[in-house]
Amino acid sequence: MRPLALLLATALCALSACAPVAPARRDVVVGLVGEPASVLADHPSARVVAAAVTEALVARDATDEFVPRLAEAVPTFDNGDLAINYEDADAPGGRLVATFRIRATARWQDGRAITAEDVRFAWDEDRSAPAGSEQRLVAERVERVEVVSERVVRIVYRANERWEGYPLAARVMPRHVLLGASADVRAAYARNPMHAGPFAVAAWLPGYGMTLAAFPEYVLGRPGLGRIEVRFFRDRSATLDALSRAEIDVAPSPVLEADLARILDRLADGTERARLLTYYSAAEAVETLRFGTRFGDQRVRRAIELTVDRQALVDSVFAGRARVPRSYLVPPVWAAIDLGIPPRPDREQARSLLAAAGYTAGNFGILERGAERLILTIAVAEGSVARVEAAQIVAGHLAAIGIAADVRVAPLREVETLVASGAHDLAVVPELARDPQLATERYVGRIGPWFDVLAIAARSAGEPAEARALYGELQRMHLEVVASLPLYQYLSVDVAPRSLGGVRPTPHLAPLTWNSAEWRFTSP
């Protein structure tokens, strides 16, 4: 029997060795919260889809470096495609000029070649985008776009400025589709855009999800996946449940937040036994407590800084994973500097400062000064459970020194408008820091004339070292007057299968799908 058993075992081994290896998966299922009105809508779910469907001439990668996409190369001084024109009489400080060369293989998803005219058309479109939108802000940094040839375009930037993000000004839109198009055609395009990304919308089932099919002629090569399935959920709890049941593979930021760290540590800890891996990324963004005009007294702002225990807030909401910043600029932003650790809470000193400002305890211990009582509202931008929880903790801390604060959640645009006008009491808002110029401009006119002068100087600084020194001084001035109170550095959370290669979250909060062409499963 033994020889027979040995023979059978040998045969089984041979058969298993000859058995075909199961192919790696070619599809992935992504879960999103909320169904957008269109792919190009201003909605978190839309941005995740749009990043897979659209493409730019140049993008920022996961290390914050510029990388060419539709362009052959990133224009630089070294390769001769970036220059400063000092011969323009209207720009005594010089004018930045960048030349972009479109790859010969760059195609729209309908097969048409992408041309320099498409770049100029996109700039024309962006100039009429809603005021305050990212497209409009970027377009306004450009003086003009010149078509040099079919595949070469020159971008001339605003006078007397140096913009670190200059390569991002070159976008494309299909001129042959949208030029002269009716409102209905444009609306249909926004819902289902034909662009140049690695995936195209193949199907959209309202109320359920979408199918994105790989674009085989994608400029950087055929995508590693053949299909991305998108599923829409009502809220993050439903998405988390689907993730735990393996009904979806990927939950990209901001679907889940770092306040779920304890749950995610059990579900997606990245160990061999876990199917999922959680990516935590310190983002170039800050959740900030902004002061309204009624807090014009620096002593009162300092008292609030000494009252709010930001480290305790971070420990409570994020299990200590997030960082408490001191500045409106945070690493890895190139202009961020180290301003030391935040001061420890000192509520006795806070009470002394408030007393020096004329406040005394009134009925129910609420501080008052003459007819003014410190009963106020903290406006909170919706869209983040963690942000609302943080605002509630701030309100609790303020109550300890006699400031009665009620938390009111409102749409982001509404809260941003309040902050811009100063008509709010206090507000908790997200503030992007990836562009130091734009981040600084939020505080122009609010700190002092010298701050405004330095902000202008930083925009036109010729050398990176000079610009960083100026931004460093701007951050010190912001800190000295307590222009705002940075509560915590935003910590983005992305969850994906351990076996899905190519997943690379970015610190600048690009949608996780920014490099979806590189995604591929490394095992069945």
Predicted segments, located by residue:
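Alpha-helical secondary-structure segments
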Residues: V29, T115-A122, E150-V156, G197-P198, ...
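N-terminal lobe/hinge region of extracytoplasmic solute-binding protein
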Residues: G31-D90, N192-H195
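Aromatic- and charge-enriched surface segment that lines or borders ligand/interaction sites
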Residues: V74-G132, R154, A242, G296
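Surface-exposed binding/hinge segments that line
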Residues: R101, R120, Q135-A181, A203, ...
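Extracellular/periplasmic solute-recognition and catalytic clefts
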Residues: R144, A202-T211, E229-T293, Q311, ...
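Ligand-site clamp/hinge motif
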Residues: A187, P216-I263, Q392-G396, G402-D406, ...
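Detector for C-terminal structural segments
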Residues: L205-Y208, A214, E305-I341, D346-R351, ...
